[in-house]
Amino acid sequence: WDHHAIVAKCALENGKNVADEVPSAMNLEECWELVNLAEQKQLNCMILENCCYDWFEMRTLNMAQHGVFGEIIRAQGAYIHNLDEFWDYYWKNPNGSDPEQLGWRLKYNRENRGDIYATHGLGPVAQALDIHRGDRMALLVAMDTKSVHGKELVEAKTGKPCNDFRN
């Protein structure tokens, strides 16, 4: 994730259009750097939200476009990504910043709050509703719960209490 904006900027600087997986940037400064550089170079830079192009989402979009659901006036999206079997496969201790050997992804979730993949659930819904293709959102509601499982994972891996898990 930390490398997405760096690689995208390098491509733009070298005259290439960019399709960058989420998250394309880790902060607003990086977002504006990508926007400004793409405009300066007159190149495309888009978030390649892979969940918009999976078979289920594409089939649902096709059905929506063919009126199978009638007029869609409300939609709800979600994204569940159980990584339990993968936590140990993420590289550990990058640049000495992960002394507990949690792996970069679990460490990120421990330190940051928020929906990491908001567009995974929202992107397909926006497509089905023709958002920015003739319609716009008037209201968006997002909900959150306390972290339970992440805290348990860190405690199991470190053998110590974890009172600072944020996501």
Language-model region placement:
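Conserved donor-binding loops in enzymes that form glycosidic bonds
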Residues: 1, 49-50
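Beta-loop-alpha module in the N-terminal Rossmann-like domain of NAD(P)-dependent dehydrogenases
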Residues: 1-37
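Short glycine/serine/threonine/alanine-rich loop segments
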Residues: 16, 43-44
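General secondary-structure edge motif
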Residues: 18, 40, 104-105
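Hydrophobic residues in well-ordered beta-strands that form the structural core
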Residues: 20, 27, 45-47, 76
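Predominantly a Rossmann-like dinucleotide-binding segment in NAD(P)-dependent oxidoreductases
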Residues: 44, 51-167
